[in-house]
Structure formats: C-alpha cells, structure tokens
Design a protein with these regions (language model features):
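Flexible "arm" and connector segments at domain edges
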Residues: 1-61, 65-101
Length: 101
C-alpha cells in the first residue's frame, strides 16, 4: 500500500517544472499554493457528497489523496516528514496526542 503512495509522491516531485500542457500535475504545481489548496477543498467537498450519497467514494478519496500530495509538494512539505510524525504517534491515543500539542 505505501509503495503506491511513494511512487505517486515521486511522480509528483518529478513533474514540478515540466511542461504544463502535457501534465496536469505540472499544471497544478505551476499555479501555486492557493490554487492547489482551492482544488483540494473542492475535492474534499466532492468526497463529502460521495460519502453522503454512498456513491463514488473510492474514486473521490483517491482524488483527495492525490490533490493533498500535490498541495504538500507545492507548499514544500516533505511527505517523509509526515510519515515520521505519524510513526511518532503510533500507540498514542488521539486525545493524548492532542493534549500534548
């Protein structure tokens, strides 16, 4: 499972600065953080609707994950740092983690 995400992260990184006419990812990255954030919000809204209607949930979830990864790349946030943060939280209650912030 994580191998697929790792490949996607690498692909997104490799598209930065490429021809925007041949790659949707390159196009999104060229538009900057605000555009990527707006697209992510749009995709989250579509996922919300899909969950409520019990239709296309898997497809919309994949869209949200893709757009989240593109947004993180646009913002210069290293995905490995997020994985490390999640590993630190393993075995810790969500309530406990939130209290310790």
């Amino acid at each position: 499972m994580s191998e697929t995400i790792e490949k996607l992260v690498k692909t997104i990184k490799s598209r930065k600065g490429n021809d925007v006419k041949s790659s949707y990812t390159s196009f999104l990255l060229s538009k900057g953080n605000d555009h990527c954030l707006n697209k992510l919000k749009e995709e989250v809204t579509e996922l919300e609707d899909a969950i409520k209607n019990k239709k296309n949930t898997v497809h919309e979830t994949a869209d949200v994950i893709y757009h989240l990864l593109v947004t993180l790349e646009s913002a210069g946030i290293n995905f490995d740092d997020i994985i490390m943060e999640l590993k630190k939280r393993e075995g810790t209650s969500g309530f406990e983690e939130k209290k310790n912030r």
